[in-house]
A protein has these predicted regions:
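N-terminal localization/anchoring segments of enzymes in phospholipid and broader phosphate metabolism
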Residues: 2-427
Length: 427
């Protein structure tokens, strides 16, 4: 196998990527123990994520879908860090380091992952700031910065802040009686520099402001305070603009967003007697696992950055300073906030096979003949209907299914949880 590199064929890109593997002649024996015959699993996944990011530059996709590809890259990288990177760090933490099939030790892999990930994430923000946002501006979709707010827009933002944000935000001053709070995995937070004394007479030079996940990260400005177009404001901009209202009587010297990614990998023993209980415990603890990555606004002062790194037990290798929002995944909301069907793919309505369009029992339909559903061309709802009926059917003893990456409002989970028969196993 060669170790040469080939140039990526994407127009305008001179990045080097691994060359295609040389296939040995037929009959030639392959040494399966040779490290050079294997790619590193984590670096290979990073390259896949990069291919997703490059879709954001593909002008054959509608503009909003290109932004979504940029967001999907962020979502993929989140999972990569909280599972893959976390797993390598766990090996080092507990002295269980093993050499991968590619010959890399965990520390070597982490160093190379950091180098490549920093490069990819820099390119992601470059694409966002210098390609996607300017193209959206041309399409009259504006991300309105604080310095660009008109007096009418600034007044609307103030009202929105006081009515929607202020009641649900809980600032946490840092002092000897108030240690650094436990922050939820991947939550948006702000570190605030302060001067003066708070309402209780305490000198608090620093505070943390967690932003509840219930708050939208993007808000659409109403048309009556804009001069046409689709105008969006970042939640971070609104909090920055009115941080002083969170700390009455104190001077806000700086406000900077940051986000911590934690270890979210599940560790279960092989000889578990109660899988469900073990999973419940692991799912609760994964919200507060060890830190694996710190994302910080690139204008955050160095002393605050170092303070955060020390607090989370991280190093410069784990630090990602970004020019823009620290969580681009939430920009997927743009598609639902703007009325521009010309800038996105049209919706697709999957069909339902004629045999199961009626309201009869899914079990009765299956008894007549096998039913094959081809997703996404055919609707998934018959599967959910089957699970709902099975959960209530007294003749069903157990429902066992593997679910991958379920959403917060999964219909399948709802169907399985809706059974009134506690004796039925749902695994």
């Amino acid at each position: 196998m060669t170790t040469e590199t080939a140039k990526n064929q994407t127009a305008g890109d001179d990045r080097s990527v691994p060359a295609p593997v040389d296939v040995p002649p037929v009959g030639e024996e392959i040494n399966l123990d040779a490290n050079e015959n294997y790619f590193n699993r984590e670096l290979s996944q990073l390259q896949f994520n990069y291919r997703v990011l490059k879709q954001a530059l593909d002008t054959t996709h509608p503009l909003i879908n290109r932004l979504i590809f940029c967001c999907i890259f962020s979502s993929n990288m989140d999972e990569f860090f909280e599972i893959r990177v976390a797993g390598l760090r766990q090996q080092m933490k507990y002295g269980r380091e093993t050499v991968g099939a590619d010959g890399m030790m965990p520390d070597q892999a982490l160093a190379e992952i950091s180098r490549v990930a920093h490069e990819y994430i820099r390119e992601q923000y470059d694409i966002l700031n210098n390609v996607l946002i300017p193209e959206m501006e041309e399409q009259n979709i504006h991300f309105v910065r604080r310095r660009e707010w008109t007096p009418e827009q600034a007044e609307w933002v103030r009202t929105y802040f006081e009515e929607e944000i202020l009641p649900v935000v809980s600032p946490i001053g840092l002092d000897p009686s108030h240690p650094f709070p436990r922050l939820v995995n991947k939550s948006l937070n702000f570190i605030v520099e302060l001067d003066g004394k708070d309402a209780f007479g305490r000198e608090t030079g620093m505070a943390i402001v967690p932003a509840p996940r219930s708050l939208p990260r993007l808000v659409r400005l109403p048309d009556d305070v804009c001069n046409g177009g689709e105008n969006l404001v970042f939640l971070s901009s609104m909090i920055h603009a009115h941080a002083d209202e969170l700390f009455p009587g104190m001077e806000v010297k700086g406000c900077y967003q940051f986000r911590l990614t934690r270890n979210a990998d599940l560790e279960l023993e092989d000889d578990l007697e109660d899988l469900a209980s073990a999973l419940r415990g692991e799912l609760l603890s994964r919200r507060f696992g060890d830190g694996v990555r710190l994302e910080v606004a690139d204008n955050c002062p160095e002393e605050l950055v170092q303070f955060l790194l020390k607090e989370f037990g991280l190093t410069e290798r784990d630090l990602y300073q970004v020019h823009g929002p620290v969580n681009l995944t939430r920009l997927m909301a743009v598609g639902g906030l703007v009325d521009r069907p010309d800038l996105t793919y049209s919706g697709f309505s999957p069909s339902i096979p004629k045999l199961i369009r009626s309201k009869e029992s899914m079990f009765d339909a299956i008894r007549k003949r096998p039913i094959l559903l081809l997703h996404p061309y055919e609707n998934f709802s018959p599967v959910v209907d089957l699970l709902r009926q099975a959960a209530k059917d007294p003749q069903v003893l157990a429902i066992r299914q593997t679910l991958y990456r379920t959403g917060a409002d999964s219909e399948i989970v709802e169907a399985l949880d809706g059974t009134t028969r506690p004796e039925a196993q749902r695994l």
